[in-house]
């Protein structure tokens, strides 16, 4: 089974690319690996507030909640396209876009990447 990485920021352009990724997955009998990346701010250790780790964790949680809220919307698009049977897995990764895409490609043994720009 072929694996297709679909990096997304959940924009309109990305949603359009998602439809194409679904159809490609259908044609090649593949599965989609949906990837959303985010980058947390870097703070100078000399000026790190005592509650920095709590702030960091709350930012991660906010990203996760936003990611989780978008998944049903993408599932609805798959159903509308008649492609609800395409397997979709989800990844949320912290880091810069290029590095996280490269890591996901290696970790997931990705065959194709489909993304909107």
Q: Residues of each region from the PLM?
A:
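A short acidic, glycine-rich active-site loop
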Residues: 52-66
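N-terminal Rossmann-like dinucleotide/flavin-binding domain of flavoprotein oxidoreductases
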Residues: 62-81
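Small/aliphatic-rich secondary-structure junction motif
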Residues: 2-54
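A structural signal for the hydrophobic beta-strands that form the central parallel beta-sheet
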Residues: 6, 34, 92-93, 114
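Short secondary-structure boundary segments
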Residues: 117
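Structural beta-alpha unit
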Residues: 75-113
């Amino acid at each position: 089974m072929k694996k297709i990485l679909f990096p997304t920021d959940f924009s309109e352009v990305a949603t359009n690319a998602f439809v194409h990724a679904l159809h490609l997955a259908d044609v090649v009998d593949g599965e989609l690996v949906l990837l959303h990346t985010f980058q947390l701010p870097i703070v100078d250790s000399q000026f790190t507030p005592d509650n920095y780790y709590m702030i960091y964790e709350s930012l991660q949680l906010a990203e996760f909640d936003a990611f989780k809220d978008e998944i049903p919307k993408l599932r609805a698009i798959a159903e509308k396209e008649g492609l609800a049977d395409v397997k979709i897995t989800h990844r949320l990764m912290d880091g810069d876009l290029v590095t996280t895409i490269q890591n996901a490609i290696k970790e997931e043994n990705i065959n194709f990447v489909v993304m909107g720009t």
